Amino acid sequence: MRSDTIKTGFEKAPHRSLLKATGTIKEKGDYRKPFIGICNSFNELIPGHAHLQELGRIAKEEVRKAGGVPFEFNTIGVCDGIAMGHIGMRYSLASRELIADSVETVAEAHRLDGLVCIPNCDKITPGMMMAALRINIPVIFVSGGPMKAGCTPSGKTVDLISVFEAVGQHSTGEISEQELESIEENACPGCGSCSGMFTANSMNCLSEALGFALPGNGTILAVDPRRNELVREASRQIITLVKNNVRPRDILSREALLNAFALDFAMGGSTNTILHTLAIANEAELDFDFSELNALSARTPYICKVSPATMAVHIEDVDRAGGISAILHELSKVEGLLDLSVPTVTGHTLGENIADAEVKDRSVIRSVEDPYSATGGLCVLYGNLAPQGSVIKTGAVSAPMMKHTGPAKVYDCQDDAIKGIMEGEVKSGDVVVIRYEGPKGGPGMPEMLSPTSVIMGRGLGDSVALITDGRFSGGSRGACIGHISPEAAEKGPIAALQNGDTITIDIPGRTISVDLTDEDIASRIAALPDFQPKIKKGYLARYSQMVTSASTGAILKTPVSCEPK
């Protein structure tokens, strides 16, 4: 066992003395058992994590019963909703790297034999996955579970996005202050990751397809008693994984990644999943290119439409309809789309995991013969505005905006854009451009939920597009194109845009372009001053210098001698 490094032999007496002082070692026989890290992310700032202390307790209890010695430790976490619309959002994506590094540090420093990872919200799940693949010891994921959707006294179903959009509605006088307060009070009824197919729930659903989590991980509600049972089962299973030395890189393959992307496209997951899955592939040293995604999306039917694409369906409804296993089982009917032979943490193949799954509600999960669209709910757009690509959640775009041409309304930061939209600067037909908000420029590639919500709230969702080198919340809807690469801070074409330039978006054609020649763009770029970092000290200053393009997952640069082969 790896942990023998810190517990076996007379020379390890000091180590054992310290371990005994923790109170976790109950008897000398514990030194012969595997040491299992309970990698929790409990904190009281994130509703998706406020209940995780109890899940950690359950995990420790089950690991000990199953023959291991549990050691709980915590990672940090950021609530994207609370961090939205101010300096805090610049820390959100950047926190993913801190989480990965911190999990690596604890597991390696203490020679743990395996990990039970308990994430939930946006950057915690991918951060833990990146660490798991980096250290490559047996790991199982069990999330905290989704939040239940809210309901106003009038019977209207609401969620967090309802609150953001209500701000825009209130600013135009469409709803009263009392109506806004009612939505605010009822949208988030308790613990769990926000209730739609936003980033957190998207990633926890993908965990099942990647093979890192047990069936039910993505959809069983945080308040459902089955969530606690799932934690118990996962905590027992880690002992089996350790005994059999089943490690993350034994599970994650190129085929498993393609399975996860197919699921993502079929349920219209968050655009952030592309960013995170590319980063996860990098940690596994798997060769996967951004440009491959459109071919897969073209073969994947969009069969499960969930908030924000529709307010009629939330994650609890997906669970009731059969969960992720049912979606995957339905997708398996498309010849060659899924590789069902890939291994998973259950000890069975993906195909075996989903063999008995069935769709219980066709209004939630459609058949592959009757999809919402024949192609997936996410895609990549290329063109002279995004030579390295950009992403859009097509499943949340209304029909009138699938093709759009309009004049650019350019803002060099999100705050100016929000102010301009609220003050009526943006008119029907415009294309709002928010730049210098990419991984380097932001820094941290902040989400644009506030401006997209204000656009929707002001009734412009069917007539205004928004493009950015930043990114979008999983809760954003409308013609929102993010991750434009190269970013403005790297003198990408988006930096050349001026007010009034004609931008054309063709989602079916997978293109985004500006009516300028290559020479026009080059001359404008040449006249620009070099980008000056907005933050000069602390973590974000270092992050800005080290982060790479969104098209590669916004991973950090490493020394050439340390780069994956």
Curated annotation (Swiss-Prot):
EC number(s) stated in the UniProt entry for this protein: 4.2.1.9
Residues involved in [2Fe-2S] cluster binding: 121, 194
A single GO molecular function term of this UniProt record: magnesium ion binding
TM region positions: none
Active site: residue positions: 473
Residues bearing PTM N6-carboxylysine: 123
Keyword Magnesium applies: yes
Any one annotated GO CC term: cytosol
Binding residues for Mg(2+): 80, 122-123, 447
Subunit structure: Homodimer.
Protein name: Dihydroxy-acid dehydratase
Species the sequence originates in: Chlorobium phaeovibrioides (strain DSM 265 / 1930) (Prosthecochloris vibrioformis (strain DSM 265))
